[in-house]
UniProtKB/Swiss-Prot annotation:
It comes from Escherichia coli O81 (strain ED1a). InterPro entries: aa-tRNA-synth_I_CS, Anticodon_Met, Met-tRNA-synth_bsu_C, Met-tRNA_ligase_1, Met-tRNA_synth, Methionyl/Leucyl_tRNA_Synth, MetRS_core, MetRS_Zn. It is an enzyme of class 6 (ligase). One of its GO terms (molecular function) is ATP binding. GO terms for biological process: methionyl-tRNA aminoacylation. This is Methionine--tRNA ligase. The lineage of its organism: Bacteria, Pseudomonadati, Pseudomonadota, Gammaproteobacteria, Enterobacterales. It comes from the Bacteria. Zn(2+) binds at C146, C149, C159, C162. Keywords: Aminoacyl-tRNA synthetase, ATP-binding, Cytoplasm, Ligase, Metal-binding, Nucleotide-binding, Protein biosynthesis, RNA-binding, tRNA-binding, Zinc.
Length: 677
């Protein structure tokens, strides 16, 4: 039956840009990719997008620890993430970042519309403040006991056990994650999104029947407990977008993160020009379909805040949320010590992507159930299903076709009714892919694979090949087996992209959903090459060991300049503005009699001379070599009386000290007296 082509926009939750992709992440991206690939096979216009979630205090602090800018860190992490997803053949049309101009503009637009419509409220709140670090503590930098279910060691914004959201001030026995100190309360003006104003709309959306039953039930609990206004602002220091007309206030990461879906799509539209319209997908009355694949830990944000923000700013709401559970490994939470906290890149060093794609797909359903990656079962299932049932079907027939018939298939089907049984299954299997009942689809396909192999066993082409005068029978039997293999691989194409490429090369034809209605008759296939190799537990053992070694390496003491000389506590811009840095010309440099550490520098500031003592003698044993160089000095440092005279400032140098100290110099063109800005 011909389907009407639909316009579909699909997203995955945005990975946070401060860590590597691991097998927990990959469940969602594989699930979405399988669904997207099926939709494309059915002729729908699908735009599949994602981005890195690149804002927040965790990124700011980690960048400080690494001694790089947040922009540099998120740029490097984006490349790593995209490499990992490409390695697993996730077919994104666009991968972007929330730290983008598109996202800034859309965040400001949505905020301004919400404000104009009266949905932004200002009020002063008491906020947790780290007295040791001198900073307000973001939600994720406070931990304590959940005020709802009393689970310990929960973050300050939501509980990973019961899913509740709350204010950090509601935590029981809170502690600063940054310093371990007990936070104190400080007042600060914050901006709030008036979520309760959307309660009626959200309840109607929940009752529409579009959402998973488990999601709808959970939302009903939240409605019954009452919706609260949502704090959408954070105080400096913070890495993110500053709120318009509110100096020192920034959008909370969870405000601009989902807008990142729109930002990534806008970036894609700009790349493609007129071929894709942003408004066609995001306008209020859009007929395009919008689906978010997310984990169960972020349902609250996507089912309440996000649709309310869109409604309040005159954009369309999602068609549906597709929510999945967590990943466990060998029946337990992923563990670094056991080597089961496995990065995506580590997996790809030991196994191919199709193997994990198949295993996850075989276990997924439309329910929000956790998926266990049992590594022994993984090996057995991949070998039993992909190798023994599917690939073996091709290999045991292709040899005869290639050797005895020059690769040409029979002109008629040996068993048309059996072939019809296979093609008739397209409706059931297609519906399973469509409804995300992936495990059911795999079971249906493997049942067909069993039928196909039973047919070959019963026809025994290896026996027929030895019997004189039965060449036509041999060709018919093996051609039938290869045609059944083609149908199976067509059904598996959304799951196994790399195996599909090899199968298409052998079959000498593209695998399409509707194409299986016409079998390959009198068709020439290519010489058969091994399509897939068996895997074994030795590979699993090597994978686990490699993961353990990565953890050990990451836990090793950090060495280098930052470890030896950590970054000082954060200062305000006003503090920094007090320091007056100027370009200075070194007119003279000489040893200081009686000191084995100091040099006396005569500096020209462009009309004013300064005398400065600097402890750089060990690094510059020939002071005359410094004469004529430009350097940077602190020009407004109070004069300091020393045994050898008065020092009227300080020159800037880098390094640990002694011989390893390096005088800073400005770029060519800087003049004495120029202010460093």
């Amino acid at each position: 039956m011909t389907q009407v082509a639909k316009k579909i926009l699909v997203t995955c939750a945005l990975p946070y840009a401060n860590g590597s992709i691991h097998l927990g992440h990959m469940l969602e991206h594989i699930q979405a990719d399988v669904w997207v690939r099926y939709q494309r096979m059915r002729g729908h216009e699908v735009n599949f997008i994602c981005a890195d979630d690149a804002h927040g205090t965790p990124i700011m602090l980690k960048a400080q620890q690494l001694g790089i800018t947040p922009e540099q860190m998120i740029g490097e992490m984006s490349q790593e993430h995209q490499t990992d997803f490409a390695g697993f053949n996730i077919s994104y049309d666009n991968y972007h970042s929330t730290h983008s101009e598109e996202n800034r503009q859309l965040s400001e637009l949505i905020y301004s519309r919400l404000k104009e419509n009266g949905f932004i409220k200002n009020r002063t709140i008491s906020q947790l403040y780290d007295p040791e670090k001198g900073m307000f503590l973001p939600d994720r930098f406070v931990k304590g006991t959940c005020p709802k279910c009393k689970s310990p060691d929960q973050y300050g914004d939501n509980c990973e056990v019961c899913g509740a959201t709350y204010s950090p001030t509601e935590l029981i026995e809170p502690k600063s994650v940054v310093s371990g100190a007990t936070p104190v309360m400080r007042d600060s003006e914050h901006f709030f999104f008036d979520l309760p104003s959307f309660s009626e709309m959200l309840q109607a959306w929940t009752r529409s029947g579009a959402l998973q039953e488990q999601v709808a039930n959970k939302m009903q609990e939240w409605f019954e407990s009452g919706l609260q206004q949502w704090d959408i602002s954070r105080d400096a220091p913070y890495f993110g977008f500053e709120i318009p007309n509110a100096p020192g206030k920034y959008f909370y990461v969870w405000l601009d993160a989902p807008i990142g879906y729109m930002g990534s799509f806008k970036n894609l539209c700009d790349k493609r020009g007129d071929s894709v319209s942003f408004d066609e997908y995001w306008k209020k009355d859009s007929t395009a379909e919008l689906y978010h694949f997310i984990g169960k830990d972020i349902v609250y944000f996507h089912s309440l805040f996000w649709p309310a923000m869109l409604e309040g700013s005159n954009f369309r709401k999602p068609t549906n949320l597709f929510v999945h559970g967590y990943v466990t490994v060998n029946g337990a939470k992923m563990s670094k010590s056991r080597g089961t906290f496995i990065k995506a890149s580590t997996w790809l060093n030991h196994f191919d992507a199709d193997s994990l794609r198949y295993y996850y797909t075989a276990k997924l359903s439309s329910r929000i159930d956790d998926i266990d990656l049992n590594l022994e079962d993984f090996v057995q299932r991949v070998n039993a299903d992909i190798v023994n049932k599917v690939v073996n079907l091709a290999s045991r027939n292709a040899g005869f076709i290639n050797k005895r018939f020059d690769g040409v298939l029979a002109s008629e089907l040996a068993d048309p009714q059996l072939y019809k049984t296979f093609t008739d299954a397209a409706e059931v299997i297609g519906e399973a892919w469509e409804s995300r009942e992936f495990g059911k689809a795999i079971r249906e396909i493997m049942a067909l694979a069993d039928l196909a192999n039973r047919y070959v066993d019963e026809q025994a082409p290896w026996v027929v090949a030895k019997q004189e005068g039965r060449d036509a029978d041999l060709q018919a039997i093996c051609s039938m087996g290869i045609n059944l293999f083609r149908v199976l691989m067509t059904y598996l194409k959304p799951v196994l992209p790399k195996l599909t490429e090899r199968a298409e090369a052998f079959l000498n034809t593209e695998l399409t959903w509707d194409g299986i209605q016409q079998p390959l008759l009198g068709h020439k296939v290519n010489p058969f090459k091994a399509l897939y190799n068996r895997i074994d537990m030795k590979q699993v053992e090597a994978l686990v060991e490699a993961s353990k070694e990565e953890v050990k390496a990451a836990a090793a003491p950090v060495t280098g300049p930052l470890a030896d000389d950590p970054i000082q506590e954060t200062i305000t811009f006003d503090d920094f503005a007090k320091v007056d840095l100027r370009v200075a010309l070194i007119e003279n440099a000489e040893f200081v009699e009686g000191s084995d550490k100091l040099l006396r520098l005569t500096l020209d500031l462009g009309g004013e001379k300064r005398n400065v003592f600097s402890g750089i003698r060990s690094a510059y044993p020939d002071p005359q070599a410094l004469i004529g160089r430009h350097t940077i000095m602190v020009a407004n440092l109070a004069p300091r009386k020393m045994r050898f005279g008065i020092s009227e400032g300080m020159v800037m140098a880098a390094g640990p000290g002694g011989k390893d100290i390096f005088l800073l110099s400005p770029d060519a063109g800087a003049k004495p007296g120029h202010q460093v800005k």
